[in-house]
């Protein structure tokens, strides 16, 4: 299909991506309809997929998707957890309608339910896992494009893209390549320049690993601040208090705490407390006449 045009030929960088993501590795079993896409069989029993046939079917699927006038009429589905992020990214890039997660039975056939849809094209990640939408698509004459492994059933599948649909990186790469080819056929991006969107954005990320990465990023600055505080605590810096110039020499001296000890203010004086003094010792005993006179005055009132 793409042998006559150099623009559509398989590039070396794309082959490198295929091999790095293990797209060429199939399963240990093979369906009789998938034998035409098998290149060889390894000694351990794993079938090797012909990547040239994979690329040709990928271009055919991209042409079918680009031929739909309204991008929202293309429905992309993935019930597998590691294909849901790729489906959502593909839908945001091309404008398709995503169904990530469980497919509600009757979405294509039951007109009463609120989630009823009438798409013109269906793209699924695995025809074995997504058998319900594939079966319903056959009832209402919707063409189906599927990412198929060597052991995938091809019943009701119109365009089968042979690849490894059980690998996290392989599924993300196939959706990324399909989105790139659709945008190139629509004229949104140029073939002369590489697509600025990275393949890593289409890969599945485990929520637990993502939380661990966020926690490590948050904990790193806190550890650094604790280390700085420990360094300042261990280093002994002798700080000499500044000498204050005293212009009034009659003033009291300013107490200065020695280095390494906290400063303690001088005790406050209690001006209300009166000092006890023995006035009788200085003045002597009172005269007897005064005491007698005071006695008589008290008696006579």
UniProtKB/Swiss-Prot annotation:
Q: Where is this region: Disordered?
A: 256-301
Q: Which UniProt keywords apply?
A: Cytoplasm, Ribonucleoprotein, Ribosomal protein
Primary subcellular site in the record, as a coarse category: cytoplasm
GO BP:
ribosomal small subunit assembly; translation
Which GO cellular component terms are attached?
cytosolic small ribosomal subunit
Q: Which Pfam families match?
A: 40S_SA_C, Ribosomal_S2
CDD domains in the cross-refs = RPS2
Where in the sequence does UniProt note compositional bias of the Pro residues kind? 256-268
Note whether Manganese occurs among the keywords.
no
Q: Which GO terms describe its molecular function?
A: structural constituent of ribosome
Q: Where in the cell is it found?
A: Cytoplasm
Q: What functional role does this protein have?
A: Required for the assembly and/or stability of the 40S ribosomal subunit. Required for the processing of the 20S rRNA-precursor to mature 18S rRNA in a late step of the maturation of 40S ribosomal subunits.
Subunit notes for this chain? Component of the small ribosomal subunit. Mature ribosomes consist of a small (40S) and a large (60S) subunit. The 40S subunit contains about 33 different proteins and 1 molecule of RNA (18S). The 60S subunit contains about 49 different proteins and 3 molecules of RNA (28S, 5.8S and 5S). Interacts with ribosomal protein S21.
Family membership: Belongs to the universal ribosomal protein uS2 family.
Name this polypeptide is given: Small ribosomal subunit protein uS2
| Source species | Pinctada fucata (Akoya pearl oyster)
């Amino acid at each position: 299909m793409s042998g006559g045009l150099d623009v559509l030929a398989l590039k070396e960088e794309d082959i490198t991506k295929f091999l790095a993501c293990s797209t060429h590795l199939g399963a240990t079993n093979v369906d009789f309809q998938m034998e035409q896409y098998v290149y060889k069989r390894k000694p351990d029993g794993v079938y090797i997929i012909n990547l040239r046939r994979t690329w040709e079917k990928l271009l055919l699927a991209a042409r079918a998707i680009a031929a739909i006038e309204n991008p929202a009429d293309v429905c992309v589905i993935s019930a597998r957890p590691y294909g849901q992020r790729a489906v959502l990214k593909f839908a945001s890039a091309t404008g398709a309608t995503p169904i990530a997660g469980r497919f509600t039975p009757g979405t294509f056939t039951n007109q009463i339910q609120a989630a009823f849809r009438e798409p013109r094209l269906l793209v699924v990640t695995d025809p074995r896992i997504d058998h319900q939408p594939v079966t319903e698509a056959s009832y209402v004459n919707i063409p189906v494009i599927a990412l198929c492994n060597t052991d995938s059933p091809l019943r009701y599948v119109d365009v089968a893209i042979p690849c490894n649909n059980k690998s996290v990186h392989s599924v993300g790469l196939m959706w990324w390549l399909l989105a790139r080819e659709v945008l190139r056929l629509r004229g949104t991006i140029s073939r002369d320049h590489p697509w600025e969107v990275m393949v890593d954005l289409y890969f599945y990320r485990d929520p637990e690993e993502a939380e661990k990465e966020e926690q490590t990023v948050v904990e790193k600055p806190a550890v650094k601040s604790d280390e700085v505080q420990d360094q300042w605590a261990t280093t002994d810096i002798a700080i000499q208090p500044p000498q204050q110039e005293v212009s009034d020499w009659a003033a009291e001296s300013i107490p200065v705490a020695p280095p390494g000890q906290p400063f303690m203010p001088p005790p406050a004086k209690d001006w209300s407390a009166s000092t006890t003094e023995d006035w009788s010792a200085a003045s002597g005993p009172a005269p007897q006449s005064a005491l007698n006179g005071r006695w008589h005055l008290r008696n006579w009132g």
